[in-house]
Amino acid sequence: MNENVIALDGPAGSGKSTVARQIAEKIGFNYLDTGAFYRALTLYLFRLYQTSPNNRFEEWVKTSEAERSLSQIRIVCEFSAGNENRILLDGEDVSLAIRTPEITREIKHIANRRIYRDFVNKELHSLAKLHKLIMDGRDIGTEVFPDAKFKFYLTASSKVRAERRFLQLQEQGIFADRNEIEKEIILRDKSDMEREIAPLYQAKDAILIDTDILSKNSVISKILEILDQ
C-alpha cells in the first residue's frame, strides 16, 4: 500500500485542485496537478502540429511523427509556496498557456491514447519516488496509483463546474463563455468516461464526495477527518 500518494479523482471542475492544494498544505504534502502534464504535452504536440497542419490534430497525434517527438519533450513541475505548480515545457514557463480553451478542447485527443498516457504516468511515478504527493486527476486511484492508501472521488453538476471554470479563467484574464464552457465540460465528461484507455470512474475503494452540496471547507474537513483515522 502506497502511503506517499493521496488520490483525488473526478470530472473536470469538481473542485479537486482547490481542495487538494489546501489539504497538501495542512498535512505537509506537495500538491501535484496531473492534468497539467497532459496539458503541457498537448500544448507541445499542438505547436508541433501547427508547423505542418496536413491533417486534423486528432488524426495527426496518431502518426509516428507525433509519437517519436515524445523522446524530445521535457516537462518539469516545480513546487512552490501555496502549492501552485509551475510547469516548464523545455525550459519555458507554460503555466498559463496550458489553460486556454484551445488546449482544453484538444487535450482529449492526447488523453485517450495509451502511448501518451504511459509517458505522463512515467513522469508521475518519478515524482512520487521523490515527494509525498496529493494528486488530482481522472485515473490516479484506478490506474496510476491503484495501491494508494487514500482515494477520493469528487463530483459536481456540469453547471456548477462550468461556473467555477469561468471564474478561474476570468481571474487569469482569459475571456470565455459560460455556456460554451459547460458544453465543453459535458463533452469532456463523455470522452473521459467512454474512452477505451483509462476511463474516468470511481474506484471501488474510493470515497465519494459531492461538492455540489458541500462547501469547500466542509469537503476539506471531511477528507482530513478520514486521513486522520
UniProtKB/Swiss-Prot annotation:
GO terms for biological process: nucleobase-containing small molecule interconversion; pyrimidine nucleotide metabolic process. Its main location: cytoplasm. Coiled coil: none annotated. InterPro entries: Cytidylate_kin (IPR003136), Cytidylate_kinase_dom (IPR011994), P-loop_NTPase (IPR027417). It is found in: Cytoplasm. Keywords: ATP-binding, Cytoplasm, Kinase, Nucleotide-binding, Transferase. SUPFAM superfamilies: P-loop containing nucleoside triphosphate hydrolases. One of its GO terms (cellular component) is cytosol. Pfam families: Cytidylate_kin (PF02224). It catalyses: CMP + ATP = CDP + ADP; dCMP + ATP = dCDP + ADP. It is an enzyme of class 2 (transferase). Disulfide bonds: none annotated. ATP binds at residues 10-18. Gene3D superfamilies: P-loop containing nucleotide triphosphate hydrolases. Its EC number is 2.7.4.25. GO terms for molecular function: (d)CMP kinase activity; ATP binding; CMP kinase activity; dCMP kinase activity. Belongs to the cytidylate kinase family. Type 1 subfamily. HAMAP family: Cytidyl_kinase_type1 (MF_00238). This is Cytidylate kinase. It comes from Leptospira interrogans serogroup Icterohaemorrhagiae serovar Lai (strain 56601).
